[in-house]
Amino acid sequence: MLTGALLILAPLFLGFALPLKNRQAMTVIHYSVEALVYFILGLLGLGLGQMEGLADQLSGMAVQVLVLVAVLFVANMASLWLFHRWQPMVPVKGEVEGNPSYRRLFLAGLKPMLAVLVGLLAGYYLLPPLPMAEIVATGALMLLLFFIGLQLRNAGLSLRKLLMNRQGLGIALALTLSSLIAGVLLIPVLELPWHDVLALASGFGWYSLSGIVIGDALGPAWGGVAFLNDVIREIIALAIIPLLISARPAMAIGYGGATAMDFTLPVIRSSGGLACVPVAIASGFLLSFLSPILMGVFLSLG
């Protein structure tokens, strides 16, 4: 089903094992990661655009995405609320800054969807079927994971220290377990094998990874479902962080999943203060590490 599902993870661990002190090289890697993300998302859109019966597929995808987002939202927020009750965390008052530009953040959140849309239109109207597209996408994903492994290793973060951050570790575990429970509940609804549904539930907001990995394994339609599920998670997170973080920071930080260490971090910092930053980085880092592992393991069972 998925060619070397576990093999795809090897570049992530290889990159994480390599120390790299050259700041100029890390800058190049940063921009390379961004370019690869949009390239991969464009290929995902290309696959969607070249599906037979595209209109019917898209209407079916809309229902699947809504169900997936809703069930995961309820399960994640319930588990994060329970964790907050068990291990309450109170942001330090006086550290909160002014809100960042939500217009800029919203537009940034639309960029990945635009990349998929461009690919979809190109596949539907312009380009003939490209037999090598799947191989190219898999290769690009492996290169992306290698670069991300390098970034994680050289971000000045100690895995031991991250694991010792009880709030960050607890948030990551709560989100992971509740997502898998939600996946179990969704098995009869999505009508997929249990391991494929659990893979869908393991994106944790990492849309560029989940979209292409799920698409490679289950076809472009399910890749689109995984992508939209994780993009919508990111957008919802941006909306709820300022509303929840002062009273229930675990819920505000945790729902964003893997995005807590990058895309949603500025909102967490400005709304919750400095005390929330180490927790967000720890939980986001751990979920970024768990997501490809869980997806690879579950998809390899098919």
Which role does the model predict for each range below?
Residues M1-F13, V33-E34, Q64-A75, M132-F147, ...:
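Structural signature of hydrophobic alpha-helical transmembrane segments
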Residues M51-M61, Y125-I135, S158-R160, P188-V189, ...:
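Membrane-interface helix termini and inter-helical loops of multi-pass transporters
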Residues L290-G302:
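Juxtamembrane boundary at the C-terminal end of a transmembrane helix
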Residues L12-L20, Q64-E95, G170-I214, I232-A247:
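Transmembrane alpha-helices that form the ion-translocation and gating core
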Residues M1, N22-I29, W81-V118, A258, ...:
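Intrinsically disordered, low-complexity non-transmembrane regions of multi-pass membrane transporters
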Residues G45, Q50, D196-I236, A247-A282:
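Alpha-helical membrane segments and immediately flanking helix-loop junctions
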Residues P11-L18, E34-Q57, V118-G123, T138-K161, ...:
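Hydrophobic transmembrane alpha-helices of secondary-active transporters
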Residues T3-L12, A55-S79, A108, P112, ...:
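Entry/N-cap segments of selected transmembrane alpha helices
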